[in-house]
Amino acid sequence: TFKKINAMSLNELYKSSPFGMFSSFFYGTIQSALFTLLAVYATSMNFTILEISIVTFLLAISGAVAQFPVGKISDVYDRRKVIIASTFGAAIFAIITIFVSGQMYLPDGLATSKTWFYMFFILFSFCSLPMFSLILAHTNDYITKDKFVAAGAGLQFTFGLGAMSGPFLCSIFMDLVGSNGFFVFLFFFHSLIGAFGIYRMRVRETVENPDSQFVAMPQTITPAGIELNPTTEPIEEPIKDENREI
């Protein structure tokens, strides 16, 4: 039993789903900055080692839990709408997190309460972390099933290209704005994805692809891992039976 997998160039992938490639690139920028500079941000905000550990734990667990409800919603409604809602939700919570970070604008009793920071950071992570799986499922809506693996590999490559610039760009934001430049950066790039999604909805109709559905995927998955997607069914091919004398 073998799986039939057809190749797909990056140009073909872009023509099939411009929004998928665009959002994959900039989500790579977001994710690399988020996971590399979160501890730097927390240290600059005078978090203790325990508090930094709590923040990184909340980031991971929120993203894992969010996969299930977000995936279910995306299989019912237009995935572009779900991506747009998630990105703008993450952008809004990123800005709110600035206000409860202890640096700005709120009364001391509220601003310095890390409980508020944790709460809004959880909501931010809940909106942001399922994004790659959503992007992959959205892209699959516009291609045939035999190209799912090739499309996933192309999106992973595009994600990696974006990831190379994330820490550098985010550090510029933090250098110009201060520690909270970290969340300003996250606000800007999430909003950029959401804005492009709105534009794409105006120029292209939604399609129904019964072969495409949300499957939770990590950002670091390889093309070989994408082949394990349970929706990619094997195709039976005849195996020649050769009798050989020994």
Where are these regions (language model features)?
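Structural signature of the two symmetry-related core transmembrane helices
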Residues: 81-96, 187
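Intrinsic disorder in cytosolic terminal tails and internal cytosolic loops
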Residues: 2, 200-246
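A membrane-interface helix-boundary motif in multi-pass transporters
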Residues: 172-190
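Helix-to-loop junctions at the C-terminal end of transmembrane segments
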Residues: 66-78, 174-175
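Helix-loop boundary and gating motifs at the non-cytosolic
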Residues: 20, 31-48, 52
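Intracellular juxtamembrane helix-capping segments at the cytosolic ends
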Residues: 129-143
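Loop-to-transmembrane helix entry/capping segments in MFS-fold secondary transporters
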Residues: 49, 143-155
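C-terminal ends and interior cores of transmembrane alpha-helices
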Residues: 89-109
